[in-house]
Amino acid sequence: MDVKPDRVIDARGSYCPGPLMELIKAYKQAKVGEVISVYSTDAGTKKDAPAWIQKSGQELVGVFDRNGYYEIVMKKVK
């Protein structure tokens, strides 16, 4: 990943819908152009967060399998 996040949400250990709710909260506070990264150990977040990002018209930068957790990265475009 060559994009440095402006905000990092560490939701490891939290279960759905917690990580997604934290991502939405950060999205609402972010300015257009900001990159938000969420760390989660919940497998549901790996599917739910990208679906919400795309449905809301934002840019999905990537979904990464890290050592024991997932990292979902989005960019606020509007």
Curated annotation (Swiss-Prot):
Q: Which domain of life is it from?
A: Archaea
* Pfam families for this protein: TusA (PF01206)
Identify its protein family.
Belongs to the sulfur carrier protein TusA family.
Q: Which Gene3D superfamilies match?
A: TusA-like domain
Q: Extract the signal peptide range.
A: none
Q: Where is the active site?
A: C16 (cysteine persulfide intermediate)
Q: What is this protein called?
A: Putative sulfur carrier protein Ta1170/Ta1414
